[in-house]
Design a protein with these regions (language model features):
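Active-site metal-coordination/substrate-binding segment of hydrolases
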Residues: 82-150, 156, 443-454
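Buried hydrophobic packing segments
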Residues: 53, 125-135, 164, 228, ...
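N-terminal helical capping/dimerization or prosegment-like subdomains
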Residues: 1-87, 92-95, 346-348, 449-451
Length: 468
């Protein structure tokens, strides 16, 4: 029921314009987590985005509530809540390499809307709000309530949603449009240890004095830079040319006195799909291990890292933890953070682990590999999340997807964690269509406007079927 009305509602050109304007209003706000301020647990940016999201909901006539700038809740009616839809308004940092537009200046090109958050997850917020508006405008009677939850800390640990559920109960049904269609019912676990090594300060040259790589644990680093004491650009350039051909990264050399500054540029990607990017940290280490450096502590540590994380190894083979199972696929690994100075280093990788992974075949193996080179590693594992495919929620969502997409519905397993990872019975549902790559977390992030409109149709039908 209601398919013809829903199609007609969203096929109106005015609806498309409304969607673009709503997403753009949210994207213009830089909602990256920063230091907490009074009443703003994740800083002013996420709080400002939440205020705008709640304003959009109120403009559509919905009751909205701000949970202390952690989460915003938007209710369809005052009945018992049957469905929670979880979206988030925070974004990862802008990074570098944008070419179509600036990160917070949304622009439409060839049916795609570009800007940080268009795909993850401000576009889906707008699609859900429009779906709720459609159900209301079409006069569909709902016996139960649907509540949209707009979070502000999904990218940095989901403290927001934990705060909300410490005060409010779970709903019988929960989905999050923070993934892709059809339905994601299995999310891999994760292992993200911090590893360290120290050594005595030394003055021999050439040596690496400092190195900085990456800006967020769940982003494959697009850039890394270092300072090499006692080496000229002329001496380093042949090594750079060879390493660039081997790795696919670019190196920029700048001399400042006796120091050589090296900037390595790769390609950013989400840490759960490292094969879609080019890791600047491992690309820089690859070069440094080829240079004629002095035999000092930093040189030995870099050679150890090169052995443990060779450039292009996104499966954890060298570390000894590569594994896979039929249900959830292979382990993936992104070496995403590294800081090094004259007396030590600290790094962290983000691995998404299959159901078959455990502390014995993953954590213990990695710690032993680190120990072999004199590193210490600390950090536990997060369990996978799984909701059976035959639950009423999943079967209903798949039916709605098939109804409006014309494609076969099926369940998927992913490496990325979504808001529902710790919510019993929850699944990720949209907004990306199969095969679409919006370069989430990378430069020129974008969403397909037509796909977002289709997603809004699907969500409207799902709200009706689950709450009607």
């Amino acid at each position: 029921m209601y398919q013809d009305q829903i199609n007609a509602y969203f096929d109106d050109p005015a609806r498309r314009q409304q969607l673009v304007e709503m997403i753009s209003r949210l994207v213009r706000i830089r909602s990256v987590r920063e230091e907490a301020q009074p009443g703003m647990p994740f800083g002013p940016g996420p709080a400002a985005a939440l205020a705008e999201g709640l304003k959009l909901a109120e403009e559509l006539g919905f009751a909205a509530k701000n949970y202390d700038n952690y989460v915003g809740a938007v209710d369809f009616n005052d009945q018992e809540t049957q469905l929670h839809i979880l979206c988030h308004l925070d974004v990862v940092g802008e990074g570098t390499g944008w070419t179509v537009t600036e990160p917070y200046e949304p622009v439409e090109v060839d049916g795609m809307l570009y800007g940080r958050g268009t795909d993850d997850d401000k576009g889906p917020v707008a699609a859900v709000l429009l779906a709720m508006q459609a159900v209301k405008d079409l006069g569909v009677p709902l016996k139960k309530n649907v509540r949209l939850l707009m979070g502000t800390d999904e990218e940095s640990g989901s403290e927001d949603i934990a705060y909300y559920y410490s005060k409010e109960p779970y709903a019988p049904c929960t989905f999050s449009p923070d993934g892709e269609f059809p339905v994601i019912n299995l999310e891999k676990g994760s292992y993200k240890p911090v590893f360290t090594k120290t050594w005595a300060a030394e003055s021999a040259t050439p040596r690496v004095k400092e190195l900085h790589g990456g800006f967020r644990i769940n982003v494959l680093p697009p850039e890394a830079q270092c300072v090499v004491a006692g080496l000229s650009a002329q001496a380093a350039r042949p090594y750079c040319d060879k390493a660039a051909a081997e790795t696919g990264v670019a190196y920029e050399l700048t001399e400042r006195g006796d120091d050589l500054h090296i900037l390595c540029k790769g390609k950013g990607a989400h840490a759960s799909t490292p094969e879609e990017g080019v890791n600047a940290i491992t690309g820089l280490i690859h070069l440094l291990c080829a240079l004629p450096l002095a035999k000092v502590g930093s040189t030995a540590a870099l050679h150890a890292l090169n052995a443990l994380f060779p450039h292009g190894d996104s499966a954890g083979k060298a570390l000894g933890i590569a594994q896979a199972d039929q249900m959830s696929g292979p382990l993936t690994l992104a070496f995403s953070l590294l800081e090094l100075n004259d007396t030590g280093l600290s790094g962290q990788f983000d691995s998404r682990v299959p159901v078959c992974a455990n502390e014995d075949n993953c954590k213990a193996v990695a710690e032993a590999a680190f120990a072999k080179f004199g590193f210490a590693a600390e950090g536990g594992m997060q369990a996978p999340h799984y909701t059976p495919a035959d639950t009423p929620l999943v079967t209903t969502l798949l039916k709605c997807y098939e109804q409006y997409s014309g494609r076969k519905g099926e369940c998927l397993a992913i490496g990325g964690g979504t808001y529902v990872h710790d919510i019993p019975g929850g699944v990720a549902f949209g907004c990306a269509m199969p095969g679409f790559n919006g370069n989430m977390h990378g430069p020129d992030e974008h969403t397909c406007i037509a796909d977002q409109l289709t997603a809004a149709k699907i969500f409207a039908q799902a709200i009706i079927d689950l709450c009607g």
